[in-house]
Amino acid sequence: MISYEFQTHLPKGKDSSLNASSENKELYVQATHFNNTILLQIRLNGEMDSTYEVSSKGLNPILDINVPLAGNLGNTGGDYDDEEEEFVRDHLSDYQVVTKLGDSADPKVPVVCVQIAELYRRVILPEVSGTMAQDNMQFSLLISMSSKIWRATKEQSADDNDFGKLVFVLKCIKDMYAK
């Protein structure tokens, strides 16, 4: 069992969907690696109110093609239909997200969980020396987090800065392993 921790404050631009009356929003990230499971806790001011289990399913274990996340970004200069020649990988179909505790109707959280799982599969697990570094990278990820990170207030639209929040959380997870 190996454990990692990271603690930071949310920048003012990232916590606009949270209660504006409180200033310091503390984000605490902790990961505990077991033999075949990673327990990831993402706390906002010490609170966690939802738990999700992310496991590898779909075509990923069978067909592990190393395709960039954005597909083929280069222009080959040929006049042909890109849809016929290019294989686009849907990473959402590679994982199964099961809500253990929390709002199962929230459409944002499964996407967040899949992005965290992709970060682990592509970046973190290959870099962590000897820890679960297997050829097929089969692992289960148990994510407990505060859903308040993704909630919007009445004054703003539902998707206001969600991408920025996701990038910030992913960066915090990656920085946790850099220490």
UniProtKB/Swiss-Prot annotation:
InterPro entries per the UniProt record, alphabetical: Psm_Assembly_Chaperone, Psome_chaperone_3/4
Biological role stated in the UniProt entry: Involved in 20S proteasome assembly, facilitating the alpha-ring formation.
Extra facts: Present with 1820 molecules/cell in log phase SD medium.
GO cellular component, one term: nucleus
GO biological process terms held by the UniProt record: chaperone-mediated protein complex assembly; nuclear-transcribed mRNA catabolic process, non-stop decay; proteasome assembly
Family stated for the protein in its record: Belongs to the PSMG3 family.
Source organism (scientific name): Saccharomyces cerevisiae (strain ATCC 204508 / S288c) (Baker's yeast)
Key words of the record: Chaperone
Protein name: Proteasome chaperone 3
A Pfam family hit: POC3_POC4
Oligomeric and partner information: Component of the 20S proteasome chaperone. Forms a heterodimer with POC4 that binds to proteasome precursors. Interacts with POP2.
